[in-house]
Amino acid sequence: MVKIDYKKCGYCGACVGVCEKLAINLIEHIIVIDEKKCNNCKLCTIVCPLNALEGE
């Protein structure tokens, strides 16, 4: 599962736009991952300019 390092996150939304399963949402300046929708493809970890997302 992908985890967010909120200390690194700039809340730019790059991960939201790339998620094919619509599992990532930007809600009031907080990135939220719906674990039920996430298929662990890790595209979000690739596009994050601040390396705030890590896949397990």
Swiss-Prot record:
Residues bound to [4Fe-4S] cluster 2: 19, 38, 41, 44
Disulfide bonds: none
A molecular-function term among this protein's GO annotations: metal ion binding
Cofactor(s) the protein requires to work: [4Fe-4S] cluster
4Fe-4S ferredoxin-type domain segment(s): 2-28, 29-56
Pfam families: Fer4 (PF00037)
Binding site residues for [4Fe-4S] cluster 1: 9, 12, 15, 48
Keywords on record: 4Fe-4S, Electron transport, Iron, Iron-sulfur, Metal-binding, Repeat, Transport
Cofactor note: Binds 2 [4Fe-4S] clusters.
Top-level taxon in the UniProt lineage: Archaea
Role summary: Ferredoxins are iron-sulfur proteins that transfer electrons in a wide variety of metabolic reactions.
Name used for this protein in its record: Uncharacterized ferredoxin MJ0533
